[in-house]
Regions:
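Primarily secretory-pathway and cell-envelope proteins
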Residues: 7-8, 12-90, 133-146
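Sequence-level detector for tyrosine residue identity
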Residues: 77, 84, 110, 119-120, ...
């Protein structure tokens, strides 16, 4: 009888651990982004690799309260027509950021180099987007394929 109780408790503990792991490592679906109007971000032709890219940001909004060349970015990936946040390889890393290689090209156009290898490693083949927050809950994004 005692042996049976130990087995049942062991199985229950194992199930709880497995459920916890499944919940913790389930990809986080991303809600719809509130995209900024009259601001475009695109990948500069010839710059895309599986470790980074150069983006060109064009601002025709006239809104001076936006932080267009902030260093923060996130990468999402698309699977089954849903977007999921790519998790950083660096434990407890909340903010991922670019290098200081950003240039004001004039005419409300900015160029920024983004190297995501430190945070995400080399990206596998798939459909992705770079997401930058330009104001609280206001975003710009550029989709790309590796």
């Amino acid at each position: 009888m005692k042996k049976r109780v130990v087995i049942v408790v062991g199985v229950l503990v194992l199930l709880i651990v497995l459920l916890t792991l499944i919940i913790c490592f389930k990809p986080r679906e991303v809600k719809d982004l509130n995209l900024a109007e009259n601001i475009a971000m695109k990948i500069k032709e010839g710059s895309l690799t599986n470790t980074g890219a150069t983006v060109i940001i064009t601002d025709l909004s006239g809104n001076e309260n936006l932080d267009l060349i902030n260093k923060k970015f996130k990468i999402d990936y698309k699977k089954n027509n849903k977007w999921y946040r790519l998790e950083s390889k660096i434990k407890n890393e909340v903010i991922v950021s670019t290098s200081d290689n950003d240039v004001d090209n004039g005419n409300n156009t900015y160029t920024q180099e983004i190297n995501w290898e430190r945070y995400y490693g080399k990206l596998d083949k798939g459909h992705y987007r770079i997401v930058k927050e330009v104001k609280t809950d206001l975003y710009i994004a550029a989709e790309f394929d590796i």
